[in-house]
Amino acid sequence: MLLKDFAQTNKQFPTDAEKLLWEHIRAKQLSVKFNRQHIIGDYIVDFVCIEKKLVIEVDGGYHSEYEQIEKDEFRTQQLRDWGFSVIRFKNEDVLGDISGVLNKIKNNLNNKNE
């Protein structure tokens, strides 16, 4: 299966946390355009604002496993090397405090304007 096929599948079957965050992002609460399940290099990122070079990742439970932590750190560094800022949230953070998550994203976007 090709990367673009995986991205399309991920769009069709988002996690509850991804779905909730997308509902808020899509409603333009952040005043910038985001894409979801977007391919950057060899990666599919959950959300990206190309204009601001900001990637948002929403991590499920398996991201706390040692091997996955190492992969995530490498991936984050690779994205940073390409000029992107990366914010990671746990599923439970998005589901339990969507206002707090949106505020962190807004703060990051505002810092990019300075």
Regions found by a protein language model. Give the residues of each.
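Basic, amphipathic alpha-helical patches used to engage nucleic acids or provide basic targeting signals
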Residues: 10-14, 41-109
